[in-house]
A protein has these predicted regions:
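Extended beta-strand/beta-hairpin segments
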Residues: 1-35, 42-134
Length: 134
């Protein structure tokens, strides 16, 4: 069974669920995906800030495949995928954003490191630049 959660950064730098939903209504498997997406998002934000890159949009979809037909207590994840959709201001910022995502995914996000011990984790990213004239 496929489970997924999507979060996005808000104006104040916090994260919110993409679909209007309360955290209390998420099942434990979705909560695991949510916490990992949150960890990755906060890590990407911190690295981008150190690189002096302002992210105009940051959306993260975290998904996983369960080994059962429905969500059960005994259900185990067989694989995970994290997809980043990011907007930055200038095209020359794209390499820095890509590097921030790579570092967060491969090195600094503890949530993803823990999931790698459970099942394989793949990732993808889409980075779009929006040239804004003054």
């Amino acid at each position: 069974m496929h489970q997924s959660i999507t979060i996005h950064a808000t104006e104040n730098g916090k994260f919110a669920l993409a679909k209007p939903c309360e955290l209390e209504k998420l099942n434990p498997k979705e909560l695991l995906l949510y916490s990992t997406a949150l960890c990755a998002g906060m890590t990407v934000q911190a690295i981008a800030e150190k690189e002096r890159v302002k992210l105009l949009k940051l959306e993260i979809k975290m998904s996983g495949e369960l080994d059962t037909e429905k969500v059960e207590g005994k259900s185990k994840f067989e694989s995970f995928n994290i997809a980043y959709n990011i907007e930055c201001k200038h095209i020359d910022e794209q390499p820095k954003v890509s590097h921030a995502v790579q570092l967060a995914t491969d090195k600094y996000c503890g949530g993803l490191a823990m999931l790698r011990k459970i099942a394989p984790v793949s990732h993808s990213m889409s980075i779009v630049s929006v040239e804004v004239e003054a």
